[in-house]
Amino acid sequence: MLTKRIIPCLDIKEGRVVKGTNFVELRDAGDPVELSKIYNEQGADELVFLDITASFEKRDIIIDVVKRTAEQVFIPLTVGGGIKTVDDFRKILRAGADKISINTSAVKTPDLIKEASEIFGTQCVVVAMDVKRKYITDSQDENLKNKNIFETKLGSCWFEVYIYGGREGTGIDAIEWAKKVEYLGAGEILLTSMDADGTKDGYDLVLTKAISENTKLPIIASGGCGNANHVVDAFTEGKADAALMASILHYRECTVNDLKKEVEKNNIPVRF
């Protein structure tokens, strides 16, 4: 089994780290550069830095914060938010990022995945997917014909891809989109459950497992981490390659090292 990764996530709004629940009710969690330094020292494998309002507000990503973070951090840094072109990729990589995460722009312009992977390499291109369960009320609905249906404790559902920071549904089935981004040249998928986001009730394991089993790409599970057992579940039941978390680290409920120790106890390889 390959070494599993623990990745703190820094959601940035107006230059500050914020955290919310189900993509709303945002509250301040600190300075991105200072938090990055802390997680670097705690043994994080990577960091994900997302400017969560950039795509929606049509605002360029904050290059200055990326530069200052990259100067302090010596682990891989993935940066996303408002990145629409190959030139945007180039600017962020020059600022110090190792990988670029795209979501809205990938859906709107799928060729960007192909173009960026050809220029910068597949390892640079992370496709972020914000996904929400769509419960089925009418099994005869014509719109369900091309959807992958899953049974959950709360009923049958399919998984819909959302864009603009979770504000707009696309009607796209998450399983089919994952297959397409793999075909187009993405190197990794950052998979966020909008239903689980910020709840601390655990990752959406049905979703994570479904995407993991339908693509060969590494999957970063995101949304819902409340304790170390949730991370273990993401790796075992969800078959994820990495686990992303925010609240439990930002509010000092545990450290990266605490999480890794618990994961290792379950015979899952991690890097210390």
Curated annotation (Swiss-Prot):
> What are the GO cellular component annotations?
cytoplasm
Pathway per its UniProt entry is: Amino-acid biosynthesis; L-histidine biosynthesis; L-histidine from 5-phospho-alpha-D-ribose 1-diphosphate: step 5/9
Q: Name one GO biological process term.
A: L-histidine biosynthetic process
InterPro entries given in the database record? Aldolase_TIM, His_biosynth, HisF, IGPS_HisA/HisF, RibuloseP-bd_barrel
Q: Where in the cell is it found?
A: Cytoplasm
* Catalysed reactions, semicolon-separated: 5-[(5-phospho-1-deoxy-D-ribulos-1-ylimino)methylamino]-1-(5-phospho-beta-D-ribosyl)imidazole-4-carboxamide + L-glutamine = D-erythro-1-(imidazol-4-yl)glycerol 3-phosphate + 5-amino-1-(5-phospho-beta-D-ribosyl)imidazole-4-carboxamide + L-glutamate + H(+)
Out of the domains of life, which is the source? Archaea
Name the predominant localization.
Answer: cytoplasm
The record's listing under Pfam families reads: His_biosynth
Catalytic center at which residues?
D11, D130
| Record-level Gene Ontology MF annotations | imidazoleglycerol-phosphate synthase activity; lyase activity
The catalytic activity of this protein is classed by the Enzyme Commission as 4.3.2.10
The record's listing under Gene3D superfamilies reads: Aldolase class I
| Alphabetized UniProt keyword annotations | Amino-acid biosynthesis, Cytoplasm, Histidine biosynthesis, Lyase
Task performed by this protein: IGPS catalyzes the conversion of PRFAR and glutamine to IGP, AICAR and glutamate. The HisF subunit catalyzes the cyclization activity that produces IGP and AICAR from PRFAR using the ammonia provided by the HisH subunit.
Q: Which PANTHER family match?
A: IMIDAZOLE GLYCEROL PHOSPHATE SYNTHASE HISHF (PTHR21235:SF2), IMIDAZOLE GLYCEROL PHOSPHATE SYNTHASE SUBUNIT HISF/H IGP SYNTHASE SUBUNIT HISF/H (PTHR21235)
> How does this polypeptide assemble, per the annotation?
Heterodimer of HisH and HisF.
Q: Return the similarity comment.
A: Belongs to the HisA/HisF family.
Q: Mind telling me what this protein is named?
A: Imidazole glycerol phosphate synthase subunit HisF
Q: Which organism is it from?
A: Methanococcus maripaludis (strain DSM 14266 / JCM 13030 / NBRC 101832 / S2 / LL)
Provide the gene name from the record.
hisF
